[in-house]
Amino acid sequence: MAAADAEAVPARGEPQQDCCVKTELLGEETPMAADEGSAEKQAGEAHMAADGETNGSCENSDASSHANAAKHTQDSARVNPQDGTNTLTRIAENGVSERDSEAAKQNHVTADDFVQTSVIGSNGYILNKPALQAQPLRTTSTLASSLPGHAAKTLPGGAGKGRTPSAFPQTPAAPPATLGEGSADTEDRKLPAPGADVKVHRARKTMPKSVVGLHAASKDPREVREARDHKEPKEEINKNISDFGRQQLLPPFPSLHQSLPQNQCYMATTKSQTACLPFVLAAAVSRKKKRRMGTYSLVPKKKTKVLKQRTVIEMFKSITHSTVGSKGEKDLGASSLHVNGESLEMDSDEDDSEELEEDDGHGAEQAAAFPTEDSRTSKESMSEADRAQKMDGESEEEQESVDTGEEEEGGDESDLSSESSIKKKFLKRKGKTDSPWIKPARKRRRRSRKKPSGALGSESYKSSAGSAEQTAPGDSTGYMEVSLDSLDLRVKGILSSQAEGLANGPDVLETDGLQEVPLCSCRMETPKSREITTLANNQCMATESVDHELGRCTNSVVKYELMRPSNKAPLLVLCEDHRGRMVKHQCCPGCGYFCTAGNFMECQPESSISHRFHKDCASRVNNASYCPHCGEESSKAKEVTIAKADTTSTVTPVPGQEKGSALEGRADTTTGSAAGPPLSEDDKLQGAASHVPEGFDPTGPAGLGRPTPGLSQGPGKETLESALIALDSEKPKKLRFHPKQLYFSARQGELQKVLLMLVDGIDPNFKMEHQNKRSPLHAAAEAGHVDICHMLVQAGANIDTCSEDQRTPLMEAAENNHLEAVKYLIKAGALVDPKDAEGSTCLHLAAKKGHYEVVQYLLSNGQMDVNCQDDGGWTPMIWATEYKHVDLVKLLLSKGSDINIRDNEENICLHWAAFSGCVDIAEILLAAKCDLHAVNIHGDSPLHIAARENRYDCVVLFLSRDSDVTLKNKEGETPLQCASLNSQVWSALQMSKALQDSAPDRPSPVERIVSRDIARGYERIPIPCVNAVDSEPCPSNYKYVSQNCVTSPMNIDRNITHLQYCVCIDDCSSSNCMCGQLSMRCWYDKDGRLLPEFNMAEPPLIFECNHACSCWRNCRNRVVQNGLRARLQLYRTRDMGWGVRSLQDIPPGTFVCEYVGELISDSEADVREEDSYLFDLDNKDGEVYCIDARFYGNVSRFINHHCEPNLVPVRVFMAHQDLRFPRIAFFSTRLIEAGEQLGFDYGERFWDIKGKLFSCRCGSPKCRHSSAALAQRQASAAQEAQEDGLPDTSSAAAADPL
């Protein structure tokens, strides 16, 4: 660590010189207890072989030939306790006598090593001991009275001056023990015997004296892959259905028909049809669920069965068909859904519910509450007016009995049924004479009469098709939906929407929840229809889309059961080929055309299942699009191009295609709808768009707009609170919701329902088992409903509740770019630093998605760490780089993001920029001094990555910045070998290599990386080692440790009861902090840098908060204990051996690194041969100790001396307050630019010893220890000596410094 690391030439003929100790003069210091900070890491034994570089001493192996120097007068009274007479046998601390056999030494050194004699130190190494007989007494040395002690590095401070009163606070700390207690060092010190030799002096670094220019000169105001999209748990289908089935099917009203497929008559097949009808909007939730298409299990805890084909005889052998009927009856019959040939009847709902309830253990209640068939029949005969009158005027007892039956019937189960339950109920009713073709509308009306509470506010209406009176499916889940008008509350006006578009009006209440995601019916069959069969004429009715052209299939038909992809498409008779393709979900549910060849969207909920559909045919609900087959978000689907099969086509193009009738492209169950000529895809899309039901908004139902974020747009906090109080006092008696409904209502923004449910006592923290245990607050935050978030928080929702994947509501809002929701949650007290199951914070999620404003707000909040890393080691900057968010990269860079942080595979941002191929980001990173030559764990440089990924622009950029085209990775591949042969990238690399090979004058050796991290991962930031000067390998004659270690007992006071601590509840920035008072004040600003008024010339002691304090670990008064944070590099200098430089701009006052090594006593330092790495821990109240970084140390052991240093050592106490063992922390004194070498002042006493061996080569114009300055001082000293008449003694020290 030499100041000059230059070769030293000892003076010829001069006696062997002692290395002197440098100590600091300390004034009075307040007593306090002590410790060392962190668990000392005992490193392994280091090699003793000399590497020719000593960073502060001579680089030759004869460094032991220094002339002995006497100690300073302050230390002259001290005698080494180990020194006896010259003839005595010396015994090392480990008990090995120097007269022992050579076997005690043979395992440690060789004859040409630093060690010249055989003293074994406490660290297990053989220490060099010159022959004692040749050691002159220090009292006889001509320099005895003028030289200080050891030539150790010292701390800054005025020599010979006591510390000023302001240097250390005189606080009545009242420690339990006086300074130095717990150690008998002082008592054990022996008085020198008469005639005894004085102890040997060693060179030690010390704190420098006050030097002009030490003060800070200027103030410079200076964050792979995607976490592999969360592997969603593959849930069983029965869990999906039992979850989704609990949602309500809202009451019918006149406009409902316009928002559902026409001509469906809402077939009396609610249970089975729901497998293809809309599931609730829960399908759009971000916690995606994997569905196994076609094998829906609609009954919880029951195994699903695959639908199997049945013959016509099997289907109808026990069913009496009505041969005579009206055309309308036939249409309705054709519309009735059959699963495996079995018709479904509405009067099976009660049986379904009974079975479902039995599964959940409610069978006993069900049996008592169910109405009989006779009662249902009698109710069926009631008129509409009678039903309305009954709903209003029915006695309370009768109403309660019906309500109880229906509520228990619905419970929290779905009104969906599975194939197995259908078969059971079919067998129960096998002997009944009911015709399966009975009008479903009549049975639906019957249910509405006997269950008024199942669909409050429902109204009957006429179908626009005009055939049968229809009603929407009632809510069989038992959730009460009550309009405010019916509640007769005083706060009705308050609860009404005060913001336009807010979904909380009385009319909107009836439309809430209608926006369900339609699912396909590709695996459903309907019994054959005579009209459609006649129309088909024994030919397949499939229409194929081939490269935007439509054609008809001409294959013959074998089976006449009808199929269609969705309710929007007509029923078709298909050939065996198209039947198979229908089952494989290759028919688009939006238009009914088979996706044969061309560009289509393909959704893959599972690896073995794929769904094809047209991009424009995706289901759209609330401005979001979903797969029309399974309801997954269409953003998960990918666009695929399917080549046209090279086989004899069975599809004949239809010439002269004309725009079809109004029925084409819409849901049509009439028998003649399939007879019209097919349309081109453009015409088809136009037709589909033109036939959207009147008044139907594909982005959401009329009046159901997403509420504008921000409480200012809706009811205020006071209004909501008063409404809750009023509702609580006037709670409706007949209101009952299931807790799961709160989740769906919160997600859909249904303010009134959420309010009513909270009033009803539903737990706002109820977690959905089948939604990854997410709470209603998760759902509201994900959708950006700030008003509902506020309502839930006011009702007691845990704002930091975690889902199964450890996501918080704030993460959901940040990931989905809901800035107002993010602001509200943070202001409401949400934590910003929790991590999900993959270690991502909300900042990671927002950066990955490119949400600029959200990232900006999170960083401006002041609580986010811009360089936080997830479980993969990726920072927000890495995510923004991979996803090519250029503006976000600039923002993060301006906020202090570290572009050289490495992930778990040691990639830096430039690797990811090369991977993504974004040359703009690559240029930004290179302009910010990103390391172009950095290699990852596989040895790949950014050029390797760019070549492998065929990123031509990035390759050209890297080559223009002198990237090494010959560098080999661990597989032995150069970037040229990584590129595809004869590609554009390959050609560019080949040309660059040819130019380098043909260069006549080869430049100096290219900088090569000799170690990617000298710390071996022990530091948070890797420290690479490079060499562009010679062939010297990375230094290996020491053991890298990140914390101070000991090799012999030090008796450091680590008693926690001896610590003085603070009880702060803030960030310890106030004057009340006890730790700050010990330091006079807290010297750190909010960025962890020293304040401008900090005394760099004579730094005071700094007491950081410790583990006994009551403050948080991230308080302001904790900086050094956070470890190394600056990007440093060990490199080979041309004339000073190894040095350390910064790879980034370091603002003034920034903690850079700590001087780490082996803690040894002053007496042991005297017997150590190599004294270039000693740092004196001056202490005037007891035994003096040193840090020796010769055998154990960190990167600071390579920092060279500089006469105008950019670093200053400061004594810091953290985990202990033992004043004998401060930790030495280096802080920047000024702005350190990237690439600048680091240096600190070793101290005058170091150069008093080492100046005779070599000179300083720092190159500063104010250098005080250069050969010229040394010669000038020697000449002046000689002249003064002659004038005083004294003999000239300077000849002994006038040797050539080189």
Swiss-Prot record:
Q: Which residues bind Zn(2+) 3?
A: C1068, C1105, C1111, C1115
Q: Which PROSITE patterns match?
A: ANK_REP_REGION (PS50297), ANK_REPEAT (PS50088), PRE_SET (PS50867), SET (PS50280)
The highest taxon in the source lineage is Eukaryota
Outcome of swapping A43V: In a breast cancer sample; somatic mutation
Q: Which UniProt keywords apply?
A: Acetylation, ANK repeat, Chromatin regulator, Chromosome, Disease variant, Intellectual disability, Isopeptide bond, Metal-binding, Methyltransferase, Nucleus, Phosphoprotein, Repeat, S-adenosyl-L-methionine, Transferase, Ubl conjugation, Zinc
Q: Which SMART domains match?
A: ANK, PreSET, SET
The covalently linked position for Glycyl lysine isopeptide (Lys-Gly) (interchain with G-Cter in SUMO1), per the record, is K22
SUBUNIT field: Heterodimer; heterodimerizes with EHMT2. Interacts with WIZ and EHMT2. Part of the E2F6.com-1 complex in G0 phase composed of E2F6, MGA, MAX, TFDP1, CBX3, BAT8, EHMT1, RING1, RNF2, MBLR, L3MBTL2 and YAF2. Interacts (via ANK repeats) with RELA (when monomethylated at 'Lys-310'). Interacts with MPHOSPH8. Interacts with CDYL. Interacts with REST only in the presence of CDYL. Part of a complex containing at least CDYL, REST, WIZ, SETB1, EHMT1 and EHMT2. Interacts with BAZ2B.
Comment block on domains = The ANK repeats recognize and bind RELA subunit of NF-kappa-B, when RELA is monomethylated at 'Lys-310'. They also specifically recognize and bind H3K9me1 and H3K9me2.
List the PANTHER family: G9A, ISOFORM B, HISTONE-LYSINE N-METHYLTRANSFERASE EHMT1
What the protein does comes down to: Histone methyltransferase that specifically mono- and dimethylates 'Lys-9' of histone H3 (H3K9me1 and H3K9me2, respectively) in euchromatin. H3K9me represents a specific tag for epigenetic transcriptional repression by recruiting HP1 proteins to methylated histones. Also weakly methylates 'Lys-27' of histone H3 (H3K27me). Also required for DNA methylation, the histone methyltransferase activity is not required for DNA methylation, suggesting that these 2 activities function independently. Probably targeted to histone H3 by different DNA-binding proteins like E2F6, MGA, MAX and/or DP1.
State the protein's name: Histone-lysine N-methyltransferase EHMT1
What is the native source organism of this protein?
Homo sapiens
Taxonomic lineage is: Eukaryota, Metazoa, Chordata, Craniata, Vertebrata
